[in-house]
Amino acid sequence: MKKYFAELVGTMVLTLLGCGTAVSLNCGADTASVVGTAVAFGLAVVAMAYTIGGISGCHINPAITLGCLLTKRISGKDAAMYMIFQVIGAIIGAAILFAFTSSDCAFAGGTTTGANSCGNHGIAAGFIAETVLTAIFVLVVLGSTDAKKGAGAFAGLAIGLSLILIHLVGIHYTGTSVNPARSIGAALFEQGQALSDLWVFIVAPFAGAAIAAGIWKAIGEE
C-alpha cells in the first residue's frame, strides 16, 4: 500500500508544482514563461524521483506505468492501482491549486489550473504532438531505468531533463501533458475546452507509451 500512496503523493506534487508554476507565470507564450514552466515540471520529477523512487519507482504518470507494464516490469494489478492512485493524486494537486489561485490563464485554453487543450492548433496536431513526445519521454524512462543498461542513480536526472526538453517543444501546441493523470486533474476543475479535449491527453499518451515499449523491446531487450 505504501508504494500506491507514494504514487499519489508524487503525482499530487508534480501537478501542484508544475501546473502551479504555469499559472503563476500566467501560462504565457513568452520565452520566460515557457522555459519557467518546462523547468518546473522537470525539477518536480527529479525531486520526486529521488524522494519516492526507492518506494514505488516514481512513475507518477499512467503512461510510464503502461510502458512498464508492456515491458513486464510491473504486474497488471500494480499497474492498475498505480494509475488509480496517480489520478487521485493529480486531482488533489489540481484541487489545491484551484483553491488558492484566481489567475487568468489564456494560454492553451487554461485559466486557473494550467490545463491542457489543443487550442487553435486542432485535435490532429495535438494528438500527434502528445503521442510523439510521450513516446520519447517513456523511451527515456525505460532506457534510463533498465536494470542492466540503465543510468542507475542518474536516471532521475535524465528523466527530469528530458521532460524539460519535451515541454519546451510541446507547450506551444498543447501546453504539454505526456501524462494522463496530470491532464485529468486539471481538466476536472478547468472545464470548458480542457474537458472536451481531455480524451486526446489520455489516448495519445497511452499510444505513445505503447510505441515506446515496442521500441525498447526491439533495441533494449535481449
Identify what each model region corresponds to.
Residues 1-222:
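Membrane-interface helix-loop junctions and terminal tails of multi-pass membrane proteins
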